[in-house]
Amino acid sequence: MIALPQDRMDQLLKRFSMIESQMANNPDSETYVKLASEYSELQEVVGKIRELTDSRKEAVDLAAMRDDASTDAEMRALALEELPGVEKRIEGLEQEVQILLLPKDAADEKNAILEIRAGTGGLEAALFAGDLFRMYERYAAEKGWRVELVSASEGDAGGYKEIIATVSGKGVFSKLKFESGVHRVQRVPETEAGGRIHTSAATVAVLPEAEDIDIEIRNEDIRIDTMRASGAGGQHVNTTDSAVRITHIPTGIMVVQAEKSQHQNRARAMQILRARLYDMERQKADTERSESRRSQVGSGDRSERIRTYNFPQGRVTDHRINLTLYKLDRVMEGDLDELVDALISDHQTALLTELGH
């Protein structure tokens, strides 16, 4: 039996009942939407707590029936037969409740900004960056998320030197946040006549999309410069100054957007700047919570080599959790659930270990 915090469970049950009552009595109030949101957040954990409470009571009743000599023999035999199944159900429910009670990452339900940059490996690295972007696009499509391109710098032989996109939908950041880091590819390039395997890499950064309420950017802390945007070969895209560079003076973070619309460039640049500042705050908070207590999966170290995609062997290996899958073709088509679920599970295990200390 897992020792669960009964006081915390009782508080949640009490709060849920209070919200139900307030929603029923004030269906047209301004606070209804806020109450409905909290109701939705608590619904799953409260449902599991109630299910667990009922199952525990059922187990107690069955054990009493089994041990009561005055009970009919057939009923005692039935109780004896049913009890192990109920106990197994309780075990599963306790694990589910334990995970649902873990501290929530405030950014989990946010949309994300996905940044992929070609690393070592030249032309092949840019091609791989393109492959990774398509992989995430397909994964997003399977999840019903929306992917919108923010900016892209194409590679000389295809793919991307850098590509930035927003990913919007339910639980986006919770699923993608463990993708940050260095992704390495081992394969024979199409241009390689000798059939030698080349190794190249791309860096992925997944940032939670920040809102004004998450991070405040003061006007005096930013410098905005406009420049002429030039396309491939150096020609001017148009005759107006459209490229925008925003510099956050206190941190030195610089964001450049060079699409055709200056107004859109400024909005996009502010969106990315806000996300990077919010991400910086989260990274700082993680560090302050003590390096030794952070789970390896959740460290978000962008310089850490997290995954290798080996094409000749048809395998993908996530080095943080020592997981190897021999279905590289499916992974590249966006079949990421097994990897993502394993990373989330490992992170939850680390959180449980932390709470136990």
UniProtKB/Swiss-Prot annotation:
It holds the Pfam family PCRF. Belongs to the prokaryotic/mitochondrial release factor family. Residues 282-294 have a biased composition (Basic and acidic residues). This is Peptide chain release factor 1. Keywords: Cytoplasm, Methylation, Protein biosynthesis. The lineage of its organism: Bacteria, Pseudomonadati, Pseudomonadota, Alphaproteobacteria, Hyphomicrobiales. The keyword Cytoplasm applies. It comes from the Bacteria. GO terms for cellular component: cytoplasm. Residues 282-308 are annotated as: Disordered. The modification N5-methylglutamine is found at residue 235. Disulfide bonds: none annotated.
